[in-house]
């Protein structure tokens, strides 16, 4: 694919005038003779990159003509003969994040030669790492009377997590940068400081909950914030509706008639639904509700709400007689038609009107499906059909499907960056794991400690993979020219003295590697929670466990996985997360004759020094460049292919 000057400038960090001076060319077919032989082959460019131009460092400089980086060897006031398109952008992406160490290795060059095309590509492996402190979660897990207060601790942990997942309606905005007293005039990125703060579970405690969603919303634009907040309100309202449906069957009888909504009293019941139920989930009220409900039922309500718009997941059985949901009371018929059937027929129009009222400009306006015209007097067949009594579950299911459809349409209005939510669905896996543990009666100190720790780890992995996805795959200019070949996440758990307790590796190939990694890691860690406290796996259990975590070949040592399942998580003080990925991008050649001639002289001089077994000059060394010798073909660099004569 041809590269424009503007695209080259964006992905190399150079100015447009500098790239215009460079005059990039991607395909050198039929123009090879314009260049020094070493500058056109993968082997020759490898030699130039490693020993002469040092491209791994030079590509990060300002290489406009006459800048300090170009004054001396080997550029002599001109840009280099090649640019690695996307390399500087990749390094800048990694530098802009909270990684503690970054390494770039295996910078290699490959060439593709076929009729009509001769191009060279570069590839590099990036390895970015940071450590999160996952030691004692003092607030809950390390209480001295843990066994005596297990239920209360479990409720507290889950309640705070639910509040973080459902009640984050007004995220902090406008971080930008600021100045601090001890930093002089240096601008401090506050958002990065807060991410650093979240690296320590012992320090941030319950504030760690919801970190991934907070950062996601903070990075969204004004329109996306409105839409994401509305989606969160719908999920919160549905969760509160489920809790109300379960807990208020008796209390609803005492509700004054004026506060009872008869649905569907009009076509826009969703507005009334949000008005009554979308108050943020409060920690105190949630703890009170938890006292009167079975733990498993509360977890299922949470999963059902968080999994929207997918599902239905674990729709909890609702108690009470009659179709009631807290302050909602349903009339048994409307024009002879069942209430749920009426809601279903009006669903599309009602959702469209709801979205149209939001203070955002819509991408496209859908034509609502016209509602079928029904006569005032129902037909005999309809009367016979409606004799079948409508169940409360049908109404609850219709409410969920309506909320789910509204969320789906709102997600379509999001920008692509904000719509991409596959990195933030890991919570459902963990709640479902807790639901299974609760059903088995297997909640103990070990499982709860691991659940908290792995949830915290997943928050970080999701945030980082989403950042890399947005910068490397969702940025159209980079994705158009640079390929993601492989991505890998390495998780190393260490004890208090720094020894590795276990190490896990997940690999994925292809353009969707980041999102595929998140799905695998979420499922893997959630399934491993259920093994906490059970010691080493028996031989007959290993195959089943490997199936549960969806183990794939070349994804780490099986013994490390078994060690992770059996370890006592109290021994783990920190977790090191390494994000490795290999990308491949295009090399562009200069069409400027003066740059080509300079390169030919540099190649000749470097080849002469090598032939004489003399060291090559250091980058930016003050070395006079000798004129080109009469022989136009200097000694070949290592492995350079002889030029064909026509």
UniProtKB/Swiss-Prot annotation:
Instruction: State the residue spans of region: Disordered.
Output: 619-646
Report any one BP term from Gene Ontology: viral DNA strand displacement replication
One GO cellular-component annotation of the UniProt record comes to:
host cell nuclear matrix
Q: Which domain of life is it from?
A: Viruses
The annotated regions of Pro residues compositional bias extend over 624-640
Where can the motif Nuclear localization signal be found?
357-366
The free-text function statement in the UniProt record for this protein reads:
Protein covalently bound to the viral DNA that acts as a primer for viral genomic replication by DNA strand displacement. Assembles on the viral origin of replication in an initiation complex with viral polymerase, DBP, host NFIA and host POU2F1/OCT1. The terminal protein stimulates the template activity over 20 fold compared to protein-free templates. Neo-synthesized viral genomes are linked to two preterminal proteins, one for each 5' end.
Q: What is this protein called?
A: Preterminal protein
One Pfam short name? Adeno_terminal
Give the stretches traversing the membrane. Answer: none
Its PTM note reads:
Preterminal protein is used to replicate viral genome, upon genomic encapsidation it is processed first into iTP and finally into TP by adenovirus protease.
Give UniProt keywords alphabetically. Covalent protein-DNA linkage, DNA replication, DNA-binding, Host nucleus, Phosphoprotein, Viral DNA replication
State one molecular function term (GO): double-stranded DNA binding
Site label Cleavage, positions: 175-176, 326-327
Quaternary context:
Heterodimer with the polymerase; this heterodimer binds to bp 9 to 18 of the genome. Interacts with host POU2F1; POU2F1 binds to the auxiliary sequences in the inverted terminal repeats and tethers the pTP-POL heterodimer to the origin DNA thereby participating in the assembly of the pre-initiation complex (POL-TP-DBP-NFIA-POU2F1).
Which family, according to the similarity comment? Belongs to the adenoviridae terminal protein family.
